[in-house]
């Protein structure tokens, strides 16, 4: 059996053929499901458009500065739109979002620095040589797809993914800092005699840049947490959480025009990019005619960076696709890793020949897309199930009939072209069945208020489902294409706002990164570790000894320093993906010898397992002997802060021992009114 599996994995084109067969069966349904959603599909479309377009605009400005205008925002937007349209129509996994990513920007900057240092290439043949790199990259991706290389994607474990994510976050911070510093200086190849480049105006531009950078960073981070605000309606908080970041970019851009009229026109400095119809933006479309001018030696030398880029794209594209198809999303349609790598090769080739930086699967936009479609699918299913349940209740049907009618609706809407009936659905709806059936028992006992109300109680029992379709990806890609034509408006954005956005992307990507969480734990003294347990925390905090966790984290820090250090090597920096490829062997053969296998499974778990916090008893401050036994050390000032308000008043704490009834329809232990007890203590 094992030999058959090995032989099967070695068959050429096996993965591509299987992917095409699987997706062909549901291709029509991919479009029908999107069109059937009506105007509801516009919500996830606009959400992903903003999440996709803003980073691409920022990367375009970074490329423009680091390649001295050879590439700009026009090219990054054009590549994202072109590849997005192709993938949404021909791609295997339509939930995957494509875009120009930071690794691509980094690679193209290395290629530029190499080209301008060679008289045979220079800036004039930079894009032509980059096109040859893309040709080699495409060929390598074709070979990977044909050889079924995507079978090894699961060997890239959490260690590799989180190290890579941390590297990108640090590079974002690095770019933000470099950008803020550059606001105090004069751009290259500019006339120093211009009014806006006098010292006082450069200094003013830098100070304004700091205000806009940190202003955007602070407001963007705050808006992302809007769902947990105590103020505003649910719709308002959801809107701010979903669209707050692009809204803050608009707000701070508008504020940048409120500066005094005596400031020169170039203060604050704004995004510099040629318009799509200007000659600098049109020249790269004909880069294919310059490819013949590249000498054969450099054509073959292009294979080396192509090898790095192909490996990087394989890793980045596959991981993005993997996270867009997490098992928690309960997707019904098959994956297409092998075919998508093949298609990525064709898109890389097209972009290279057009003088565009290639696009690949991006994070976190891809899982964000799936999540937004899960919300849409939930709304569609809920609406129909509530309508059916209300109709059954109005007809005074039994609880059994009410549940059967709702189950029938769910199964009908959950049908897949590949599996018309899924036996697991019955199991997933078991909690809903118990809730509906128990409501009948409660009504018989005369407790009508405890009856099942579909409007209030259905949400708690609906399984996760995703509206798997192609329309939202196509529409958001067309919107990105429209953004190319909106360049006159995009150029109004101050560059300092983009530096703030880089910092925002870095900080926003850290929560959930266990490497970062363990890094912060190293700075928590023994006497304060109980604070970590009071809040929600990853499972390794309780299951792995502190010494093992610290050793594993220190090893990651060392390896991260190695990866980051490679990016600083002038020409050899293009080899920075190599350490990540080596992690496959290190994780499989070396780490198991250094760490307990059980501990290693927790520290490098495939899933993010979180344990709820266990807050201390609110009265525990009155019993210091208990704390001393646990080694908890708190100063008198800290104790006093917990006992008093900011006005210096002693707090009166009321302990409520009643169980929280909330919106749960049937708590395990049902407490009747008056059974609880209230006790008040004065500290």
UniProtKB/Swiss-Prot annotation:
Q: Which residues lie on this side of the membrane: Extracellular?
A: 60-80, 148-160, 222-238, 316-335, 499-565
Keyword field contains Secreted: no
List localization entries: Membrane
The record ties this protein, via Pfam families, to: HCO3_cotransp
Q: Which residues form a coiled coil?
A: none
Transmembrane regions listed in the UniProt entry: 39-59, 81-101, 127-147, 161-181, 201-221, 239-259, 295-315, 336-356, 478-498, 566-586
Gene Ontology CC entries for this record: plasma membrane
Outline the inducing conditions.
Up-regulated by boron supply.
What biological processes does GO assign it? borate transport; cellular response to boron-containing substance levels; monoatomic anion transport
Q: What keywords were assigned to this record?
A: Anion exchange, Ion transport, Membrane, Transmembrane, Transmembrane helix, Transport
Instruction: Write out the ranges of the annotated region (Disordered).
Output: 617-638, 661-683
**Residue intervals annotated with topology Cytoplasmic:** 1-38, 102-126, 182-200, 260-294, 357-477, 587-683
User: Which body tissues produce this protein?
Assistant: Expressed in the distal sides of epidermal cells in the elongation zone of roots.
Q: Give yes or no: UniProt keyword Chloroplast.
A: no
One MF term in the entry's GO annotations: borate efflux transmembrane transporter activity
Q: Give the top-rank taxon of the lineage listed in the UniProt record for this protein.
A: Eukaryota
InterPro entries assigned to the protein according to its UniProt record, in alphabetical order: HCO3_transpt-like_TM_dom (IPR011531), HCO3_transpt_euk (IPR003020)
Do you know which PANTHER family this protein is assigned to?
ANION EXCHANGE PROTEIN, BORON TRANSPORTER 4-RELATED
What biological function has been recorded for the protein in this entry? Efflux-type boron transporter polarly localized in roots. Boron is essential for maintaining the integrity of plants cell walls.
Family assignment?
A: Belongs to the anion exchanger (TC 2.A.31.3) family.
Return the protein name: Boron transporter 4
- Annotated source species: Arabidopsis thaliana
For this protein's source organism, the top of the classification is: Eukaryota, Viridiplantae, Streptophyta, Embryophyta, Tracheophyta
The gene it comes from is: BOR4
